[in-house]
From Swiss-Prot:
Protein name (Swiss-Prot/TrEMBL): Peroxidase 5
Annotated organism of origin: Vitis vinifera (Grape)
Pfam family, one: peroxidase
Role of this protein: Removal of H(2)O(2), oxidation of toxic reductants, biosynthesis and degradation of lignin, suberization, auxin catabolism, response to environmental stresses such as wounding, pathogen attack and oxidative stress. These functions might be dependent on each isozyme/isoform in each plant tissue.
Glycosylated sites: N213
Amino acid sequence: MSSKRVTWLSLTWVLVFLCLSVELEAQLQVGFYRTSCGLAEFIVKDEVRKGFIRDSGVAPGLVRMHFHDCFVRGCDGSVLIDSTPSNTAEKDSPANNPSLRGFEVIDSAKARLEAVCKGVVSCADIVAFAARDSVEITGGLGYDVPAGRRDGRISLASEASTNLPPPTFTVDQLTQFFSNKGLTQDEMVTLSGAHTIGRSHCSSFSNRLYNFNGTSGQDPTLDPQYAASLKTQCPQGSTNTNLVVPMNPSSPSITDVGYYVDVLRNRGLFTSDQTLLTDTTTATQVRQNAGNPFLWKNKFASAMVKMGQLGVLIGEAGQIRANCRVINS
């Protein structure tokens, strides 16, 4: 091999190494606030704990908040921004209002962090930390959260409607939707397991009870006994928009594989839950998750980390909001 070729190859490897180094430096990092705000993750965890004691529903709310944040414009905290007279923000989209909850936990954590580390910890990172802590406090596995996200300046209700999968989606639609976000079909099935905690408003699934596919009947794939119970809790023609039911009646506050067990019993609450059995591959994944709790919890933690890195703002992009509800002036 000639000396010129050796030199060329050496330079090529140097350039590759430098490019990789720059890319790695630009990514999120575990322990990002270790020196700039060492108590950051502890403070968020403490606020999640206090919120959970007041209302256990806060935990599933915060997990869902992280998902809804990341799928719209990336994980930039835009779901936290309040609407103004001139703009309807994400949180007031029908996909989020009135179902999203846990905002007060984020507010409390941010207020404490601003008191000890002014202008350091982003709202987007607080949401990511709070989601992790919510998984852990409900019995899931804790996991390291790479941080360093910056906060976005734009929040549009219209974007929430087009970037969040509705509860009526089929397995093919879900697979494509998650693929568009860079997530695999297996990760879609894994993250769907978040429905093992929390609640749903009756309006999100009432079509399965009273008007399935434009008929006057109920969804034939829905377990009859479960359907009867749901009809009791969600009477036909009710004008009460606050009626809710647990996603997983047997253990609504525990992060376990109850969701997958329910789906196998034809007790998935949403069409988008039960549809997982209509595809050979996803049905196999449902059965595997139902029978391997520890495996699913590990997969769920990994999928949450990956989801938490969607479309993030880093470096000098975005801002660090002083108030998570308001864009800095």
